[in-house]
Amino acid sequence: MKIWIKTGHPTGEVVRVFGFDWFRLHFIENPGMAWGWEFGNETGKMILTLFRLTAVIFGTWYIGRIVKQQYSKGFIICAGLIYAGALGNLIDSMFYGMIFDKGLHYDAAINDYISYGGIAQFSSNGYSSFLHGSVVDMLYFPIIKSNFPSWFPVIGGDEFEFFSPIFN
C-alpha cells in the first residue's frame, strides 16, 4: 500500500476512504519518528534508522517468545501490528531513498528537510542514500473535531482533534 501511495499520489493529497470523513488517506513523508519528532541532520537520521533496526531485531525475538509462551491471540495480534509498523518504517528508511526519484530529503545547505512536487517514480538514481529514506505515512482518522470548553485551563477554546496523528 505504501508503494501505491508513493507512486500514485502527490504529497499532501487527501482521499476519503469509502466517502467517510473520519477515515482518510493523507500522504505525508516523515524523516523522523512518531509525531514528526526527529534527531535533526543526516547523522540523526542514520542513528534513528539503526535504532529501528535494533527494535525490529528485538521485536522478532519478542514475537517468537510470546507465540511460544502462548500469550492471548489479541496480545499477539497487537504486538504483531506494532512490529509490522516498525518493520515497514525500517524498510522505508533503508531503501526508499535509493529506489525512488523523489522524496523528502535533508539539504545541508539550509540545515532542513525539503519536500518535492509531483509524484515519485521508481528510479535507479534515488533521491538519497542507504539508511536515509523518509517514511511514508498515510492513515488518518480524524474521528472527533471539536473545541475544548472555554472554562478549560490554558487551552480553553482551542481546537481539539482526536485522532490527529497520520501514521502507516
List the predicted regions and their residue ranges.
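Alpha-helical transmembrane bundles and membrane-interface segments of multipass inner-membrane proteins
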Residues: 1-168
